[in-house]
Amino acid sequence: MATRFMTDPHAMRDMAGRFEVHAQTVEDEARRMWASAQNISGAGWSGMAEATSLDTMAQMNQAFRNIVNMLHGVRDGLVRDANNYEQQEQASQQILSS
């Protein structure tokens, strides 16, 4: 049974939109987490404990930033590839019609 691979630029752009929504969600949650950590930080923590807590939170914040960057990279790649596919499809149609 032969399988046909079909490229759907509109579906690729729709999926890119989903990746953007996921990136925004991760970014919003990371921002809330950071604000919460800042509020907790001053509540009875001091010295090394506070510094360690803030360092851990900074590392987590960077990890979330990396996730957001990767999601944006996937989004951008899907949009770019959808555009390239459409351009190549148009060029092929022009060649075939001439």
Curated annotation (Swiss-Prot):
GO CC terms of this entry: extracellular region
Keywords for this protein: Secreted
Localization annotation: Secreted
Primary site of residence: secreted
Keyword Secreted attached: yes
Subunit comment: Forms a complex with EsxO.
Family: Belongs to the WXG100 family. CFP-10 subfamily.
The protein's name in its UniProt record: ESAT-6-like protein EsxP
Species of provenance: Mycobacterium tuberculosis (strain ATCC 25618 / H37Rv)
Organism lineage: Bacteria, Bacillati, Actinomycetota, Actinomycetes, Mycobacteriales
